[in-house]
Amino acid sequence: MAPGLWGPSPPVVLLLLSLLGLAAAGKLLVTSVDGSPWFSIREGLDMLRQKGHEVVVVVPEVSLNIKTSENFVIKRYPVPFTQEDMDNAVKTLFRIIFEGGSFLERYFKGMENMKIVSDFIVSSCEQLLQNKELIRYLEESKFDAILTDPVIPCGVILAEHLSLPSVYFLRGIPCGLDFEASQCPNPPSYVPRSFSDLTDQMTFFQRVKNLLFDTQNLFLCDFAFEPYSKLASEFLQREVTVQDLLRNGSVWLLRMEFVLDYPRPLMPNMIPIGGANCAHKELPQEFEAVVNASGEHGIVVFSLGSMVSEIPMKKAMEIAEALGTVPQTVFWRYTGKAPPNLPKNVKLVKWLPQNDLLAHPKTRAFITHGGSHGVYEGICNAVPMVLMPLFGDQMDNAKRVESRGAGLTLNILEMTSSDISNALKAVINDKKYKENIQRLSDLHLDRPIHPLDLAVHWVEFVMRHKGAPHLRPAAHDLNWVQYHSLDVIAFLAAVTLLSLFISFKCCLCCCRRFCCKKGRTGKATKAKSH
């Protein structure tokens, strides 16, 4: 009997299956994701593209790390500043970090330069919202969802305008606005605030300090997000704040995981995906050859992140001197001028496959600035760390690694060559650091689904179901008084006081009656006796 009588041939089945996959594919808009977060999410976007989804990335002509890609569509829009302007501002910011002088002097210089960078970012957002041609394209493209980093809330404003369900991809908002907007409990008694340099085990005065940071964070949020609230109100043509818009997020993909971060409450739509960037590939041949030639001593990986292009020569020479005191071969990612005392065991490279090197069994230590991207790579690959935090959440990340016994933290301004050498030798030679980071790595990897797959799943989930309203807590519909049950407490207190008052009055009345009756009885008895 002819095969065609029983059903379609295999090629036809494959064609039908491929068409079914295309029918299920969605369209994702990505915006306001640059810098280190871009490196963390890029692999997830590649995976979404491989699954048949169309990915459109909206990015300004001037960006930090986003380049062209074959896997997704890049839509660029003009901005009123150049790449050189942005690069110079970032370089100046990091130069100030390394400069000497008093704390206040460095603080005000840093704030002044940070404002320049911030103005560039706000201006970029304004140009996007005012680009009528691009906005029209986005309106007509019928996206299923938007993926954005809410730290730069331009994507959040776009999501509201386009009526799109949003997936937030972030490490955290420094002033705690993420937890406030999501109605997530954030008790200061055991949840350390950003930049507080505290752990979850706090003394009384540390808890006082932690609570005071909440007051500081209120001003920080107002200062940082007021320009975006103004932009949003003008663009959406109604009075609105960034916090109002953030409340509409469908899913929060948090670049955190409780192996590193301290246990704390999360809402049902908050998904920890720390370590999503840990998949590694084979080393390029030129790196593999150097690693194999390192012998029994192995290698050390050193990188202060993609944004630090150079450091002052004096500091670079101190670092070079320290690196020469260990027998390991050191890969140092550095694009500045090579220090004249660079030892033979140090290989300066403009780029290195960081995660692939950390995954190599010959890697003995990782010197890092403490960015969450690199820290999770260190944990995934069980490499003890020497941390030199520069700014932002890096101080908090370093504190967490050190409190777990998986590394040592150095003050990059005050550290000497001897400090660097001693810290590096300690994490290499003292077995406790390797044992502790190995334990963290085992805990982190012992999970039913890889963080990257989990992140991709939730993006697809939001695209398929047009959001996740079933995960939205009713707390969003309550005011402050209702949320804290102050009205209920007041009602119960009033009922209790009223009951006590009535009981008191009843007792008083009974006592008076009893006393009066007793008085009359006494008088009657006296009258009879006479």
Please place each PLM-identified region on the residue numbering.
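Donor nucleotide-sugar binding/catalytic pocket of nucleotide-sugar-dependent glycosyltransferases
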Residues: 251-255, 268-278
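A generic secondary-structure signal marking the coil-to-beta-strand transition
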Residues: 248-250, 269, 298-300, 344-345
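Glycosyltransferase specificity loop/lid
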Residues: 2-234, 243, 260, 274-281, ...
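Conserved, non-catalytic sequence blocks in retroelement Pol enzymes and Pol-derived host proteins
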Residues: 240
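Extracellular structured ligand-interaction cores
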Residues: 163-165, 249, 267
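Long, low-complexity segments enriched in small/aliphatic residues
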Residues: 245-260
